[in-house]
């Protein structure tokens, strides 16, 4: 014991010195006669290597705590382990703030750059911006319209553009707009709309909050995001409409927006009133059957509402696309970066709800160099055959609109849609009856439901007896 008492304090001090600064322990191991000088040198070494004073205090506190258990313990391993733990924690605490400011630097170049595709548009080389996966489709859809309208121009050799440059061009367009009316009230309202649009600009790079209404192709719940489209004079359309020939769906959906309809479905399904439960189920079925967010009635209304040669933004499946109308047909601008080198792929036809479309070039001629299906024709065909295919395609589309109308003034397509809708209505009408019968059967299981169940059980008994014989 006498041998351990004079040596235990020295390892304890050595443990604290090693836990903080291992290099100072070798220098300070020589002078054992002046422990105060060694403590002062330890403090100086700690202050030089570690600037924060709190980190120099943490090991000293651990050293003070080690002095009390030393007479009880015969060895000093617990001392260095307790002395090293605060050091590890302080090192991690110092290293974490150093990594945080580096993360924004690494994230900056990732979503900023977008490839520019040059297309011949009405006799002039015009740029359009392509997007990769999860790109800022609202910003690109608006900017592509401004490029196609030649309100924003880029240098001829521009191949890559950043989102900051796009935002700057869009901001300049908004600030250059002047109110048409000179009255003070309208000017104040116009200035307020400009301020709202400028505050919304950063959201265009991430996504817009758009809430559709199912009553019209241009019916949206007004939000500050819509002020950007209003100021630029860009129409915003959608095709998610309720068919007026389905009165039950019209009654269940009404004039509600999408968010309001979802809330109503939840409240109706938890209601004790069977009529409200039925309306909630009908509204829920409407959302499920129209999950593509485009109906045939909406497509017809969209074709009628869009003007010839008009450039607009089409919203579907939480995606914004640049849309135009050419010769009574709707086309969507192809902005997928995978078609960057495909000069003949510029527009995509929108004539079907199921997504069956065709690619066209900048002059709305059917593209033969690339197709969506495996049986698409290649570019090796002669010009005569390509021209014949173009004519056949245009004739097929024109016949779709020039079909002879029946006694009710409906085309074959509309008649087929009406028959499909009538069948859908019959299914909807049968569902409430089935639901009510189920509710009644659940309520009156005691007496009425026993007889048919007993009869159904007797039949398999006879069949089983016959099988056994």
Swiss-Prot record:
Catalytic activity: Thiol-dependent hydrolysis of ester, thioester, amide, peptide and isopeptide bonds formed by the C-terminal Gly of ubiquitin (a 76-residue protein attached to proteins as an intracellular targeting signal)
Composition bias type Low complexity, residue spans: 66-76
Outcome reported for the amino acid change (mutating residue 423 to A): Loss of binding to 'Lys-48' tetraubiquitin chains
Consequence of substituting residue 240 to A: Abolishes ubiquitin hydrolase activity
Annotated family: Belongs to the MINDY deubiquitinase family. FAM63 subfamily.
Effect of residue 315 to A: Abolishes ubiquitin hydrolase activity
Region Ubiquitin-binding domain (UBD), residue ranges: 388-426
GO CC annotations, alphabetized: nuclear body; nucleoplasm
Residue numbers spanned by region Disordered: 1-85, 441-469
Biased composition (Basic and acidic residues): 23-53, 453-469
Outcome following mutation: residue 415 to A: Loss of binding to 'Lys-48' tetraubiquitin chains
Site entry (Ubiquitin-binding), positions: 412, 415-416, 419
Domain of life according to the entry: Eukaryota
Effect of residue 210 to A: Greatly impairs ubiquitin hydrolase activity
UniProt effect for mutating residue 396 to G: No effect on binding to 'Lys-48' tetraubiquitin chains
EC id: 3.4.19.12
Protein name (database record): Ubiquitin carboxyl-terminal hydrolase MINDY-1
Name of a matching Pfam family: MINDY_DUB
Residue positions where Phosphoserine is found in the record: 103, 441
Effect in UniProt of substituting residue 319 to A: Abolishes ubiquitin hydrolase activity
GO MF annotation terms: cysteine-type carboxypeptidase activity; cysteine-type deubiquitinase activity; K48-linked deubiquitinase activity; K48-linked polyubiquitin modification-dependent protein binding
Gene name as annotated: MINDY1
Entry annotation: catalytic residues: 137 (nucleophile), 319 (proton acceptor)
